[in-house]
């Protein structure tokens, strides 16, 4: 089936729906408002974490999708989780970000497995409205980069205080941090209205952060030395919810795939021409409440995997066909409403873990070409 959306000159103007993949779905847990996913290396094995947006569990799974244990039962409000580099299971997580209207008490915590088989949870830093964060390494240093969706909230749907991006060098030893002694953060960019999207992208051997907001998409590059500052590049100025850099057409230069605007219904791919990102493709159908995003290889092909939480609530993959010079779309699931996805390879098979928030299920999709 081929659809012909309205396009302008020099853009890819054909979307082809295909069925090239063999997909097996397995529901591995039921978790109300399941949201965040993160890989975790623990006791020498590859695992992953899934946590809830509201007050509910954080669950540790093995790579087969079997539940290992519960890390916590509350307070929830988990938007992001990231393993501490080199640690045996220790990770950072957001707590108490329940929604844009209920995130004043949000913080970043340290979760550490203890010798008695339990988990210690301590405060790293109180940061109201913190939504996304990550750990980025460069030249032997590890940096925490944290994004607040907004900077204040007085009434429902209050967007009068734009979000900010914070950063700090993360010490190797986190044992001293708690509610009384917290990590000191520095604002590296403010004015980030609806500061929602985050994706780590490796470019020229350097870990970088692609951050999306109402004022556009930015790439944050960590300091090269102790005497230098973060480098910040604006990639586009279009209101955006999430974005990732990926070389989808395999021409050696990364394109920019964008979900727009904030929690919006549009998917665009931009191609860099003469140093400027120009629109290359617009998905012909509205994709209501776009949210989940993965950019990377899927079954050996550069792919953008997208999930949305309203309308058809689908999970689908976009790829580029060089012979036909078109974008191909393959549906993975419908009626699921993913909030986030995580991809890995096991036994030469591609695995996608999705937190299908709208139906309260954690799903494992095993995908083969």
Residue ranges of each PLM-predicted region?
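Short, Lys/Arg-enriched N-terminal segments with co-localized hydrophobic residues
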Residues: 3-20
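Beta-propeller-forming repeat regions
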Residues: 17-369
């Amino acid at each position: 089936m081929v659809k012909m959306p309205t396009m302008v000159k020099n853009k890819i103007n054909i979307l082809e729906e295909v069925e090239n993949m063999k997909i097996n779905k397995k529901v591995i847990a039921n978790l109300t408002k399941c949201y965040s996913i993160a890989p975790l290396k623990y006791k020498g094995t590859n695992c992953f974490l899934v946590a809830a947006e509201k007050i509910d569990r954080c669950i540790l799974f093995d790579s087969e999708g079997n539940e290992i244990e519960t890390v916590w039962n509350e307070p929830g409000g988990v938007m992001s989780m990231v393993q501490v580099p080199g640690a045996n299971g220790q990770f950072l997580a957001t707590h108490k970000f329940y929604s844009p209207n209920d995130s004043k008490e949000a913080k970043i915590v340290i979760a550490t497995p203890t010798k008695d088989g339990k988990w210690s949870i301590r405060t790293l830093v109180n940061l109201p409205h913190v939504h996304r964060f990550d750990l980025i390494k460069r030249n032997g240093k590890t940096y925490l980069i944290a994004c607040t969706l907004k900077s204040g909230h007085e009434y429902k749907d209050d967007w009068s205080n734009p979000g900010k991006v914070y950063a700090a060098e993360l010490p190797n030893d986190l044992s001293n941090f708690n509610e009384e002694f917290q990590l000191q953060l520095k604002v590296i960019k403010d004015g980030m209205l609806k500061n929602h999207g985050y994706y780590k992208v490796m470019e020229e051997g350097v870990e970088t952060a692609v951050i999306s907001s109402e004022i556009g998409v930015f790439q944050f590059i960590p300091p090269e030395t102790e005497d230098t500052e973060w480098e910040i590049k604006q990639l586009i100025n279009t209101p955006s919810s999430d974005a990732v850099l990926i070389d989808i057409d395999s021409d050696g230069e990364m394109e920019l795939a964008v979900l727009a605007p904030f929690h919006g219904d549009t998917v665009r791919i931009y191609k860099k021409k003469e140093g400027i990102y120009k629109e290359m493709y617009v998905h012909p159908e509205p994709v209501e409440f776009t949210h989940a995003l993965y950019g990377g290889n899927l079954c050996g092909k550069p792919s953008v995997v997208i999930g949305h939480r309203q309308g058809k609530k689908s999970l689908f993959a976009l790829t580029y066909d060089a012979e036909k010079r078109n974008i191909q779309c393959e549906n993975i699931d419908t009626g699921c409403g993913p909030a986030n996805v995580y991809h890995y390879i096991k036994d030469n098979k591609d695995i996608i873990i999705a937190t299908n928030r709208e139906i309260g299920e954690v799903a494992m999709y095993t995908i083969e070409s």
